[in-house]
């Protein structure tokens, strides 16, 4: 390649190190500070030796930990739970900590509801994310990506930059802000707010619960103000759709609009950002895969995008709550128990994927659960995310084809999001 990089290339397909079960601590934030390889090795051990196991909830300041949770680590179990919302309910929360009234004020959106109300709420915005509509905004996505990569080159004559702040972060943020009708002048504020909300617990981002609640209040107030404007000034945007929609014969309340808004801007920003970043990191580690893709970009793009999402698994887990007693793999779990669905583990399950440790851009079939396990809560923005990922890599291929990570990434300290805070890159 000829470019200086401290990223060690690897033999593609190398399994992670063995991790003894006694060393695994899903209920400790220290475990989530470990390298990805160790984490992958830990989940491989759990799939093999304890596919369903019980863990305490991580204690985060201000949050109510509540009871521990049953961790499902095998693909088939995660898939089953995703497809049986009558047993594995999204209510009252999708993270392992307990929902409190003050948190529900801002995070009580459709993602923590079950059908039929979940489906009625989802239908308000789902039209904006269909393949046909996403195809219509392709030109806008490409224009944004082209400008961001061009600016990255123009603003960094030394040909060194942080991929996250210059491309992977701004691209999905700008697109979802455009769709919501958020003015450009406010994009950076939205970016900061979403970082605090999903990065809480990471010392670089936020560990003060009062700050977390203030940011939640700020974004809620912003959403309410934007919605009030749309009540009198209709725009062709998602905020207007929320304001004008009726569910069960009633308009959404300001609180419902605010929590819906928070869900869309947070989910529409963070997950795609991390998929793009993990993708560039993987192409840096396995340069033969990049050469293969660049030589047939359009031909490989559909499978390449799916493999990047499998590899990244941007959302690490989702929680469900049992509505009845159930027995899985000989493990008895009771109504009211918390159950965690570990997508990161399911996407490396040796019983489901041939060579799961191989980053293979031509992988087919690839039934990954990177957008969730299907069913009612399948990722609403999956079509948009796929488009953004594809376009981002196409622009990199066109403008800086030899882009490579120069250092290991700064990883987000989080049990919930497989995040990267910074990834230094260079190009020739």
From Swiss-Prot:
Positions with a binding annotation for heme: 379
Keyword Membrane: no
Record's keyword terms, sorted: Fatty acid metabolism, Heme, Iron, Lipid metabolism, Metal-binding, Monooxygenase, NADP, Oxidoreductase
Pathway the protein contributes to: Lipid metabolism; branched-chain fatty acid metabolism
EC code(s) of this entry: 1.14.15.14, 1.14.15.28
Gene Ontology BP annotations: cholesterol catabolic process; fatty acid omega-oxidation; methyl-branched fatty acid metabolic process
Catalytic reaction list: a methyl-branched lipid + O2 + 2 reduced ferredoxin [iron-sulfur] cluster + 2 H(+) = an omega-hydroxy-methyl-branched lipid + H2O + 2 oxidized ferredoxin [iron-sulfur] cluster; cholest-4-en-3-one + 6 reduced [2Fe-2S]-[ferredoxin] + 3 O2 + 5 H(+) = (25R)-3-oxocholest-4-en-26-oate + 6 oxidized [2Fe-2S]-[ferredoxin] + 4 H2O; 15-methylhexadecanoate + NADPH + O2 + H(+) = omega-hydroxy-15-methyl-hexadecanoate + NADP(+) + H2O; 3,7,11,15-tetramethylhexadecanoate + NADPH + O2 + H(+) = omega-hydroxy-3,7,11,15-tetramethyl-hexadecanoate + NADP(+) + H2O
Leader peptide range in chain numbering: none
InterPro entries: Cyt_P450 (IPR001128), Cyt_P450_B (IPR002397), Cyt_P450_sf (IPR036396)
Protein's UniProt keywords contain Nucleotide-binding: no
Class of the enzyme per the UniProt entry, highest EC level: oxidoreductase
Names of required cofactors: heme
Molecular function via GO: cholest-4-en-3-one 26-monooxygenase activity; cholesterol 26-hydroxylase activity; heme binding; iron ion binding; NADPH binding; steroid hydroxylase activity
Functional note: Primarily hydroxylates the omega-carbon of a number of methyl-branched lipids, including (2E,6E)-farnesol, phytanate, geranylgeraniol, 15-methylpalmitate and (2E,6E)-farnesyl diphosphate. Also catalyzes the sequential oxidation of the terminal methyl of cholest-4-en-3-one into (25R)-26-hydroxycholest-4-en-3-one (alcohol), (25R)-26-oxocholest-4-en-3-one (aldehyde), to finally yield the carboxylic acid (25R)-3-oxocholest-4-en-26-oate. Cyp124 catalyzes preferentially the oxidation of (25R)-26-hydroxycholest-4-en-3-one diastereomer.
Family: Belongs to the cytochrome P450 family.
Record-given protein name: Methyl-branched lipid omega-hydroxylase
Gene it is expressed from: cyp124
């Amino acid at each position: 390649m000829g470019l200086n990089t401290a990223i060690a290339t690897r033999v593609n397909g190398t399994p992670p190190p063995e991790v003894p079960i006694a060393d695994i601590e899903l209920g400790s934030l220290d475990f989530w500070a470990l390298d990805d390889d160790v984490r992958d090795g830990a989940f491989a051990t759990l799939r093999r030796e304890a596919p369903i196991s019980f863990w305490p909830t991580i204690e985060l300041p201000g949050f109510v930990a509540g009871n521990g949770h049953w961790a499902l680590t095998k693909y088939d179990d995660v898939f089953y739970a995703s497809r049986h919302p009558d047993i594995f309910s999204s209510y009252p929360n999708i993270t392992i900590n307990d929902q409190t009234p003050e948190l529900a004020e801002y995070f009580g959106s459709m993602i923590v509801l079950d059908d039929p109300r979940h489906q009625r709420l989802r239908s308000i915005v789902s039209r904006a994310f269909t393949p046909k509509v996403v195809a219509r905004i392709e030109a806008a996505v490409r224009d944004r990506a082209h400008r961001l990569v061009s600016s990255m080159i123009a603003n960094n004559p030394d040909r060194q930059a942080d991929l996250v702040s210059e491309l992977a972060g701004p691209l999905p943020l700008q697109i979802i802000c455009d769709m919501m009708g958020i003015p450009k002048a406010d994009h950076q504020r939205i970016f900061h707010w979403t970082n605090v909300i999903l990065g809480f617990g990471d010392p670089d981002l936020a560990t003060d619960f009062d700050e977390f609640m203030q940011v939640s209040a700020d974004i809620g107030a912003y959403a309410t103000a934007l919605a009030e404007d749309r009540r009198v000034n209709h725009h062709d945007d998602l905020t207007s759709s929320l304001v004008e929609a009726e569910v069960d014969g009633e308009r959404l309340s300001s609180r419902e609009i605010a929590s819906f808004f928070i869900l869309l801007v947070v989910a529409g920003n963070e997950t795609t950002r991390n998929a793009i970043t993990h993708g560039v990191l993987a192409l840096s580690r396995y340069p033969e895969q990049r050469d293969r893709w660049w030589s047939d970009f359009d031909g490989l793009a559909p499978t390449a995008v799916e493999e990047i999402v499998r590899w990244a698994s941007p959302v690490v887990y989702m929680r469900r709550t049992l509505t009845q007693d159930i027995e899985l793999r000989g493990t008895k779990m009771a109504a009211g128990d918390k159950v965690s669905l570990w997508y990161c583990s399911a996407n490396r399950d040796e019983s489901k994927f041939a060579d799961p440790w191989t980053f293979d851009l031509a992988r087919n079939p690839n039934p990954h659960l990177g957008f969730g396990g299907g069913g009612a809560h399948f990722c609403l923005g999956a079509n948009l995310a796929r488009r953004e990922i594809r376009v981002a890599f196409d622009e990199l291929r066109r403008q800086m084809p030899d882009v490579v990570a120069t250092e290991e990434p700064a990883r987000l300290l989080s049990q919930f999001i497989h995040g990267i805070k910074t990834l230094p890159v260079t190009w020739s």
